[in-house]
Amino acid sequence: KLLKKLKPNVVFSKGGFVSVPVVLAAKACKVPALIHESDMTPGLANKLCIPSAAKVCCNFPETVKCLPENKAVLTGTPIRQELLSGDAREGLKFCGFNAAKPVILVIGGSLGSVAVNNAVRSILPELLKDFQVIHLCGKDKLDASLNGTEGYVQFEYIKDELPDLFAAADLIISRAGANAICEISALAKPNILIPLSANASRGDQIL
């Protein structure tokens, strides 16, 4: 009903279970659907949607072989341009840091990672001997006992200041999500990526 009311020229889907009925409805309404697959191999939702899609855009060259030849289009992943225009000095100022020590930026994913947070905090005294640490730890995952620690700042989430923090970072430690990989690659920053295990995912991040 919504598609008939809106009468879109095209439907764009990034996957996820909510996308399946929308893409199927688009085909029924004769509205072309474009799918974007960020990961190395298609997820379940996109697999279900591919037969109904006009084209399937993908992030990695290796993904093309998993898709119908007449539908696959290698596009990469769009990068927010503002991420490329950060100011390192502003990033240091925002964190209360100086330029005397290099900066490590730790990103635990959109929801944060207990395992990553615990690992960083367990070796924090050693890290702070040689580095300053910016820690994006996720909602409700701040450690109040570390507030005021010199050379260490923690945030649940950062939005507007993120480009400046990226610019200030000398090393990025991050979960290995597709968007994170593409953004860090675009920034040409040294990085350490932490993939999900094969038990917790399709194994794409390990690949």
Positions of the model-derived regions?
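Glycosyltransferases and closely related glycan-assembly transferases
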Residues: L2-F12, V18-L34, K47-S52
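Well-ordered beta-strand positions
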Residues: V10, A54-K55, K71, L171, ...
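A donor-sugar binding/catalytic signature common to diverse glycosyltransferases
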Residues: S13-K14, L162-R202
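Residue-level detector of alpha-helix initiation sites
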Residues: G16-V18, M40, L44, S110-L111, ...
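Active-site-proximal region of nucleotide-activated glycan assembly enzymes
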Residues: K27-R89
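Hydrophobic beta-strand scaffold residues
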Residues: A33, V133-H135, N191
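Short, glycine/polar-rich helix-capping loops at beta-to-alpha or helix-loop-helix junctions
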Residues: P42-N46, N59-L67, D143-A144, A180, ...
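Donor-nucleotide binding loops and adjacent catalytic segments primarily
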Residues: A88-E90, F97-L171, I181, D204-L207
